[in-house]
C-alpha cells in the first residue's frame, strides 16, 4: 500500500484567468461557489499490500485525528485500486486480494464509516470520464517534468517503456480530488508536485469553461521527523519485498521479533561505547511512537526521550534495553489496533457492506461534479435544449 496514500487549511479562491472572456461565453452561476461552504477531505492508499506502521505514522494517525476533529463536513477515503493497476496490470489478483486487507487496516486504526466514506476507486466510473476530459488540458511535456512522476518511473524501472495509464496518473489524481470537491488533501512533501499539477488543471479548466472546479489546499503532516519510517534493517524505506516492515496486522510475537532484530548504530559494539541516535532506526521509531507516559509505565528511570538519548550517546546503555522499551511502546500502541482488526475480521460481511455503501455514496458525489463539468463544457447534450437551436 502507498499513501497517496497525508494543518488546518481553508478553501482558497481560484484565480479567474481569462475571466471576462469566460463569463461572456458561459453566462451561468459559478458551480464552484455553490459548493464553496463545505470543507471536504480526500485521501487514500493503493491496495498493493497490507498497511504497515510507516503508513500509520505517515498518514493513518493523522486521518483519524482529522476525522474526529469536527472541522470537516465530508471525508472521503479511497482504496485506489485503479491506480494500483497502472503498474500491476498483469497481476490484478494482487490488487483484488488487498482490497479487504486495506479496509481492515483502516477500520482497525479507527477510521469510522459513520464519519468517513470509505470507497473503492474503480467502483466510481465517473473518475475515469473526468480523467479523460482533463487529459486534453495537460501536455505530455508537463507530465514529464513532474518530479514525483520522474521518481516513480525510475523506482519502477519504467524508463524504457512507460505504461500510458501509469504516466497519466497525476491527471487521474486530479480527477479523484476534484470529483469530490476536496478543499484539503493530506499529503507528504514528496507528493507536493502532484497537488501542484492538480491545481494547474483546476485553473486551466476554470479559465476555459468558467468557475466549476474547487482548488484543494494541502495538509502537510505535523510530525515531519516521522514522514517516512525506515525499514527495520535500516534501509531508507519499508518494503514488502525486502521483508523489513512491521505490519499493523502483525501478531504481538511478530512485532517483538522484528523490534528485537532491528538495525542500530553499527559502531555501538559494547554497552559502555557512546551510541549515535541520528539515523538509528530504534530511535527514529521512538520519536514516532513514544509518549512521556510510556516512561512512567515501562522505563521509570527516565522522564522523557531526551534523557534516554543523552544516556545512549554518553555510553553505558545497551541496545537490548532500548529495543525492549521500544517493543513495550509499540505493543501499547498496536494492541487496540490489533483488537479492532480481530473484530472486523470476524465481521467481513459488514466490511463488504461498508465498502459497497461507501462506493455508492462516492459515486453519487462524483456524478454531481461530472454533471457540472459536462454542463460547463457544453457537452450535456440531452440536458441542454439549446442544442436543438443550433447553439
Language-model-detected regions and their locations in the chain:
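Low-complexity, intrinsically disordered or signal/transmembrane-proximal segments
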Residues: 9-10, 21, 26, 35
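N-terminal Rossmann-like or analogous alpha/beta NTP/dinucleotide-binding catalytic cores
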Residues: 32-175, 293, 332-334, 342
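A short secondary-structure junction signal
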Residues: 145-146, 182-183, 210, 240-241
Amino acid at each position: 500500500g502507498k499513501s497517496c496514500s497525508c494543518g488546518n487549511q481553508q478553501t482558497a479562491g481560484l484565480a479567474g484567468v481569462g475571466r471576462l472572456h469566460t463569463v461572456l461565453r458561459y453566462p451561468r452561476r459559478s458551480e464552484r461557489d455553490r459548493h464553496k461552504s463545505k470543507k471536504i477531505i480526500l485521501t487514500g492508499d493503493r491496495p498493493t499490500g497490507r498497511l504497515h506502521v510507516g503508513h500509520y505514522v505517515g498518514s493513518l494517525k493523522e486521518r483519524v485525528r482529522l476525522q474526529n476533529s469536527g472541522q470537516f463536513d465530508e471525508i472521503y477515503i479511497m482504496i485506489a485500486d485503479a491506480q494500483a493497476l497502472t503498474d500491476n496490470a498483469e497481476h490484478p489478483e494482487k490488487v483484488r486480494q488487498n482490497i479487504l486487507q486495506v479496509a481492515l487496516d483502516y477500520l482497525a486504526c479507527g477510521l469510522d464509516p459513520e464519519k468517513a466514506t470509505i470507497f473503492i476507486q474503480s467502483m466510481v466510473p465517473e473518475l475515469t470520464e473526468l480523467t479523460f476530459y482533463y487529459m486534453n488540458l495537460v501536455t505530455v511535456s508537463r507530465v514529464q517534468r513532474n518530479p514525483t512522476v520522474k521518481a516513480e518511473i525510475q523506482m519502477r524501472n519504467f524508463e524504457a517503456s512507460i505504461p500510458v495509464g501509469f504516466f497519466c496518473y497525476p491527471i487521474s489524481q486530479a480527477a479523484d480530488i476534484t470529483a469530490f470537491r476536496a478543499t484539503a488533501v493530506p499529503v507528504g512533501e514528496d507528493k507536493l508536485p502532484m497537488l501542484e499539477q492538480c491545481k494547474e488543471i483546476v485553473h486551466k479548466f476554470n479559465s476555459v469553461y468558467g468557475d466549476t472546479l474547487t482548488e484543494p489546499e494541502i495538509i502537510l503532516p505535523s510530525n515531519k521527523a516521522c514522514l517516512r519510517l525506515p525499514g527495520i534493517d535500516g534501509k531508507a524505506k519499508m518494503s514488502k519485498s525486502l521483508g523489513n516492515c512491521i505490519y499493523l496486522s502483525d501478531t504481538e510475537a511478530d512485532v517483538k521479533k522484528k523490534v528485537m532484530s532491528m538495525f542500530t548504530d553499527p559502531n555501538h559494539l559494547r554497552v559502555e561505547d557512546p551510541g549515535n541516535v541520528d539515523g538509528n532506526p530504534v530511535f527514529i521509531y521512538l520519536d514516532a511512537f513514544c509518549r512521556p507516559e510510556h516512561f512512567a509505565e515501562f522505563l521509570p528511570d527516565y522522564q522523557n526521550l531526551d534523557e534516554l538519548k543523552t544516556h545512549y550517546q554518553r555510553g553505558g546503555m545497551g541496545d537490548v534495553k532500548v529495543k525492549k522499551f521500544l517493543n513495550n511502546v509499540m505493543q501499547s500502541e498496536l494492541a487496540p489496533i490489533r483488537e479492532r482488526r480481530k473484530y472486523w475480521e470476524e465481521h467481513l460481511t459488514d466490511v463488504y457492506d461498508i465498502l459497497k455503501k461507501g462506493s455508492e455514496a462516492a459515486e453519487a458525489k462524483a456524478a454531481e461534479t461530472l454533471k457540472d463539468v459536462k454542463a460547463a463544457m457544453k457537452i450535456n447534450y440531452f440536458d441542454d435544449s439549446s442544442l436543438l437551436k443550433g447553439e
